[in-house]
Each structure stands twice: as structure tokens, then as C-alpha cells.
Swiss-Prot record:
GO terms for cellular component: cell cortex; cytoplasm; nucleolus; ruffle; trans-Golgi network membrane. Residues 46-84 are annotated as: Disordered. The keyword Transferase does not apply. Pfam families: Arfaptin (PF06456). Transmembrane segments: none annotated. It comes from Rattus norvegicus (Rat). Keywords: Autophagy, Golgi apparatus, Membrane, Phosphoprotein. Forms homodimers or heterodimers with ARFIP1. Interacts with RAC1. Specifically binds to GTP-bound ARF1 and ARF6, but binds to RAC1.GTP and RAC1.GDP with similar affinities. Interacts with ARL1. Interacts (via N-terminus) with IKBKB and IKBKG; these interactions inhibit activation of NF-kappa-B. This is Arfaptin-2. Residues 121-321 form the AH domain. It is found in: Golgi apparatus; Golgi apparatus, trans-Golgi network membrane. InterPro entries: AH/BAR_dom_sf, AH_dom, Arfaptin_fam. The keyword Lipoprotein does not apply. One of its GO terms (biological process) is intracellular protein transport.
């Protein structure tokens, strides 16, 4: 009955056998992270209720907390408010029940995959792209960290050059016999300081752009990837459940459960395929955006650094103009907070 449905999937199911390959799986901390990811989607209940009896109990078994503090001796029939309270408690019980069943199935599926007793659906091409994105993000984070370190060093160098230029200028006024030597050294330090401020502005722009790419664009795509991975786990959990029911005996009771399981499986399959498509689209747009952004930023970084160490002040200023980077005029005071508004 399910062969037609399962055969249409664009992905493949990779069986995992307990023949010793389980030793190559990730460490236990990775398993704990996956289990936490399964458990984070628990229900959010605004009101607390106590459930008496088992799952098969009636709605009367739901007792709102606080109702037993002052027991009433009145035998008057229940009013509309009591019926509403029972209805709300029943809905919350259903939410908790569904969440518990879903969590149990997903945890069972996850453990089955990890210990080599189950199969998982894998889109090989998409999984490769996701792993490549995570590796790229780690490398870009390293570049971002180094860029911030370079910014800090440049700022410290500028402060030292500025102080050294002031010291040379002061000594030029107080040492007539060395006035010329102190004078041109002071001018050299001031020129280096000016070019350094221009370079610092370019590096700051470079770091800011990479930070946006890593913490905004890439992170947004990875959030969708996490949703996709959770949907994949749910899909496989309900697929396994449907397969087990299909292999069991067929009677009147089983037929109803099989139809219900098939409907639930189809819902999770649709969710999984939708998120798989979303991830593929976001990965494509992310790659295009990354190439566009980094082409501009790497050109800026190369031109600015080359011009600075070549002592080409004109080319350095032209580089900032080319990328529309504006700096405060040399010697200008920092504007007040009111002027910045």
C-alpha cells in the first residue's frame, strides 16, 4: 500500500547495519545535541493542569491546579465556565500527548540510526552542499577573527605614530640644532598616520561586510537547514512506523490505524520536501551573494593594502572613493551624539 508513496521520493534511504560500523559514528556529545534538538520543540502551555487517570480517561479527569485548595460542598450543576475550562484543559492535554508521541518516535528513530538498526533518507547532493556551507562558514569566521585582530593592531599603530609625530614636533621647537631633522620626521609620522587612517577605514569596511555575510546571511541559511534536518528525522520516524504497520496483520482495527499512519506520514513527507526545496533555493542564493560580496571586498582589501605599503596616498584615497567609503577629515573632532542624529 505504501510502495507507491515511498517509491516517489527523490531521495534515497541508506540502511545502517550493526556490523561494527557504528564505531565510526560521532561521539556521544553529538548524540546528546541531536536529542536536545528533538526535545526543544515542546509545547508551550500558559496554564497548568493536572491529569488524573490514564490516556484513555475522560475529560473529567482533568483537574485545573488550584481548584482543590478550597473544595466546594455545593452540589449545583456545572456552569458554562466549567465546560470551557474542561475544553481548554482537554486541548492542552492533546497538545502534550501529540508532542510526547512525536518526540518518542523521533528519539527512537535517532537512536535506531545511531546504533545501526535503522535507515535514514539522504539527499546526497544536498547533504554535500550543506557540509560545504558549514566548512565555508568556519573558514570565514577565521578570516573575520583575523580581520578584527588586524584592525586592532592598525589602531594601536596609529596611536603610536600620532604620539611619535607630536613628540618630534615638540622637540623640533625646543632643539634649534636638530629642528630640521625632528621636523621632517614629524611630517613623515603625520603622513603615515593619515594613510593609516585611510587604510583602517578600508579594513573596517571589509570586516563589517564579512561579519554581515557570516552572522546574517549564512546563519539564516543554516537555521533553515536545522529545520530541514528536524523535518527529515520526523519524516523517517513516521515512514518507519508506516512500514512496520504495513508488514503487520490486516484486520479491521489495523486498517484504521494504517490509514491514520499513512495520512500522518504524508503530512510529514510534504513538510520535509518543502523544507528541502527551501534549503536548495537558499543555498543557491547564498552562493551567488557570497561571490558578489567577496569579489568587491577582496578587491577593496587588495587595493587598499597595496597602496598603503607602496606609500601611494593618491591611489589609497581613490580606492576608498571607488567603494564609496567616507572617512572623517584628518584632525576633525568626533561629532556629538546630537549631530549624528
Amino acid at each position: 500500500m505504501t510502495d507507491g508513496i515511498l517509491g516517489k521520493a527523490a531521495t534515497m534511504e541508506i540502511p545502517i547495519h550493526g556490523n561494527g560500523e557504528a564505531g565510526q559514528l560521532p561521539e556521544d556529545d553529538g548524540l546528546e545535541q541531536d536529542l536536545q534538538q528533538v526535545m526543544v520543540s515542546g509545547p508551550n502551555l500558559n496554564e497548568t493542569s493536572i491529569v488524573s487517570g490514564g490516556y484513555g480517561g475522560s475529560g473529567d479527569g482533568l483537574i485545573p491546579t488550584g481548584s482543590g485548595r478550597h473544595p466546594s460542598h455545593s452540589t449545583s450543576p456545572s456552569g458554562p465556565g466549567d465546560e470551557v475550562a474542561r475544553g481548554i484543559a482537554g486541548e492542552k492535554f492533546d497538545i502534550v500527548k501529540k508532542w510526547g508521541i512525536n518526540t518518542y518516535k523521533c528519539t527512537k528513530q535517532l537512536l535506531s540510526e545511531r546504533f545501526g538498526r535503522g535507515s535514514r533518507t539522504v539527499d546526497l547532493e544536498l547533504e554535500l552542499q550543506i557540509e560545504l556551507l558549514r566548512e565555508t562558514k568556519r573558514k570565514y569566521e577565521s578570516v573575520l577573527q583575523l580581520g578584527r585582530a588586524l584592525t586592532a593592531h592598525l589602531y594601536s599603530l596609529l596611536q603610536t605614530q600620532h604620539a611619535l609625530g607630536d613628540a618630534f614636533a615638540d622637540l623640533s621647537q625646543k632643539s634649534p640644532e636638530l629642528q630640521e631633522e625632528f621636523g621632517y620626521n614629524a611630517e613623515t609620522q603625520k603622513l603615515l598616520c593619515k594613510n593609516g587612517e585611510t587604510l583602517l577605514g578600508a579594513v573596517n569596511f571589509f570586516v563589517s561586510s564579512i561579519n554581515t555575510l557570516v552572522t546574517k546571511t549564512m546563519e539564516d541559511t543554516l537555521m533553515t537547514v536545522k529545520q530541514y534536518e528536524a523535518a527529515r528525522l520526523e519524516y523517517d520516524a513516521y515512514r518507519t512506523d508506516l512500514e512496520e504497520l504495513s508488514l503487520g496483520p490486516r484486520d479491521a482495527g489495523t486498517r484504521g490505524r494504517l490509514e491514520s499512519a499513512q495520512a500522518t506520514f504524508q503530512t510529514h513527507r510534504d513538510k520535509y520536501e518543502k523544507l528541502r526545496g527551501d534549503v536548495a533555493i537558499k543555498l543557491k542564493f547564498l552562493e551567488e551573494n557570497k561571490i558578489k560580496v567577496m569579489h568587491k571586498q577582496l578587491l577593496l582589501f587588495h587595493n587598499a593594502v597595496s597602496a598603503y605599503f607602496a606609500g601611494n596616498q593618491k591611489q589609497l584615497e581613490q580606492t576608498l572613493q571607488q567603494f564609496n567609503i567616507k572617512l572623517r577629515p584628518p584632525g576633525a573632532e568626533k561629532p556629538s551624539w546630537l549631530e549624528e542624529q
